[in-house]
Amino acid sequence: MSESAFAERIVHNLLDTDFYKLTMMQGVLHNYPDADVEWEFRCRNGEDLRPYLGEIRNQLERLADLTLDDGQLAFLERISFLKPDFLRFLRLFRFNLRYVHVGIENDQLFLRLKGPWLHVILFEVPLLAIISEVRNRNLHPHMRLAEARDQLYRKFDWLRAHASDDELAELQVADFGTRRRFSSRVQEEVARVLRDDFPGRFVGTSNVDLAWKLDIKPLGTMAHEWIMAHQQLGPRLIDSQIAALDCWVREYRGLLGIALTDCITMDAFLGDFDLYFAKLFDGLRHDSGEPVAWAEKAIAHYQKLGIDPMTKTLVFSDGLNLTRSLEIFRALRGRINVSFGIGTNLTCDIPGVAPMNIVLKMTDCNGAPVAKISDEAAKTQCRDENFVAYMRHVFKVPSKE
């Protein structure tokens, strides 16, 4: 009988998170160490998670004893843009549970983070992974690793049957599946199989722990929170995206050059993404809206600025599977470089399992609301309708109503 898909402890170390949480955390340490934030959990499909509160709380409390060991620190020290002062801070870092509020409110699971951005930032990914795995092991207690592995090999067979050797040689795929994974063991098995047997080009994982354990590249730059926080970090709202990109450039000096475009909308982003940023950043990440239409806007923007799109890369990460990735790849091949970050469809695609649709998003920074409008109406998020309306007005974004 194959190994169980579950381990008793869900999050084993500080590196069991997405790489961009560390890159943003360094940016926060150096630029906004005093910023205060609030985050709220949302289950987008209304699933009743109340029965799992006790187990979630138990796993949450175990985060408090996690530390960085010498081997993990040595791995991070080999990453040139992670600075010594940040690594010293990380060596001392502990999860502080006083910033986490969890319980039942309005007949549903309630989870809020409130505290210094620097100390709250690492909670998001492990908390989502805990909620996902606790729910999955209650619904599917006898799941074995072999079922996830077999499903992945079926996908490889499909890809070999539908893509040419030339296409496979260029098709770049990464694991972006930490936060909504079936379990930590399943994600590790998926990453190992991708590393060893993926028929295309497996380029890395967003999970820092797996990058360390499996000797693969950690991937990620920035998330929505980086741009959202800048809505309340000093500049005028109209200048907030520019401030976020400019701060990133000053922090990383041309490294980690993939910018996220849909915090407001792609059109609003391109209005701020001038020749300076377009030359400095290596490319853009898509996370909402129709991907090929979005890519056409990016290509046209680069061409208008006199930049050859083949010197830039588009990273796609919005609810992808291998089938959709191949379609996008074919639509854009030879016009701009592309790469695909696949999450839930790699780490929680098992026959009979419905993946969760859960998010934990920043709602406030320094006591004032922040918002994500995005290129997809369902992904708009803000606790303050007036602030969303004001932001739409400032950035000339029409209402999706």
Curated annotation (Swiss-Prot):
> From which domain of life does this come?
Bacteria
EC number(s) given by UniProt: 6.3.4.21
Per the record, the pathway is: Cofactor biosynthesis; NAD(+) biosynthesis; nicotinate D-ribonucleotide from nicotinate: step 1/1
| Gene Ontology, cellular component aspect | cytosol
- PTM: Transiently phosphorylated on a His residue during the reaction cycle. Phosphorylation strongly increases the affinity for substrates and increases the rate of nicotinate D-ribonucleotide production. Dephosphorylation regenerates the low-affinity form of the enzyme, leading to product release.
Please name the GO terms that the record assigns under molecular function: nicotinate phosphoribosyltransferase activity
Does Cell cycle count among this protein's keywords? no
Could you list the residue ranges that cross the membrane? Answer: none
Which BP terms from GO are recorded?
A: NAD biosynthetic process via the salvage pathway
Checking InterPro entries in the record gives: N/Namide_PRibTrfase (IPR041525), NAPRTase_N (IPR040727), Nic_PRibTrfase (IPR006406), Nic_PRibTrfase-Fam (IPR007229), Nicotinate_pribotase-like_C (IPR036068)
Quickly give the catalysed reaction. nicotinate + 5-phospho-alpha-D-ribose 1-diphosphate + ATP + H2O = nicotinate beta-D-ribonucleotide + ADP + phosphate + diphosphate
Key words, A-Z: Ligase, Phosphoprotein, Pyridine nucleotide biosynthesis
Which Pfam families does this chain map to? NAPRTase, NAPRTase_N
In-chain residues carrying the UniProt-annotated modification Phosphohistidine: H224
Q: Which PANTHER family match?
A: NICOTINATE PHOSPHORIBOSYLTRANSFERASE (PTHR11098:SF1)
Family according to the record: Belongs to the NAPRTase family.
Protein's job:
Catalyzes the synthesis of beta-nicotinate D-ribonucleotide from nicotinate and 5-phospho-D-ribose 1-phosphate at the expense of ATP.
Under which name does UniProt file this protein? Nicotinate phosphoribosyltransferase
Q: Which organism is it from?
A: Pseudomonas putida (strain ATCC 47054 / DSM 6125 / CFBP 8728 / NCIMB 11950 / KT2440)
What's the encoding gene here? pncB
